[in-house]
């Protein structure tokens, strides 16, 4: 009997490890936090989270995935004039993103910083930053300064912490992974 129980335990552990190695994201962790606006679309079999703040410009964070445990995208969004550059000061570290090509290729009327393997260190730092100050430089040369603070920052950090706790980079859909190279071309990052 002990051998049978040991065998069942071993099989359960192997199945659990295989399931986890497959890169499955449990989006239901967001249901536990009533401050997080989790939208579930049973028709499209998808989930999404949007966190927005408006100071000098609309700034938001978005994450989207599928109900079967995949992540499609996560990123910061800045709406307004097309921006050539985004500088984000996280505590004492400056991250600079050249977003000029997004204006040409995507014509968003703003810009976005997408979570990719190249920008993962930025989003990990954002998940624990005490201060987040942002400067957008528009195509016309205007600087727009804003910050993410208070409950907005706490909500973004909660989502990022959950994403990284579940090894988000191994949970992306194939289409999501396919966009990484393009995203990195449209948002080259430097760190000072």
Each PLM stretch: what is its role?
Residues 1-4:
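Positively charged n-region of N-terminal signal peptides that target proteins for export
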Residues 21-192:
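A generic "folded-domain core" signal
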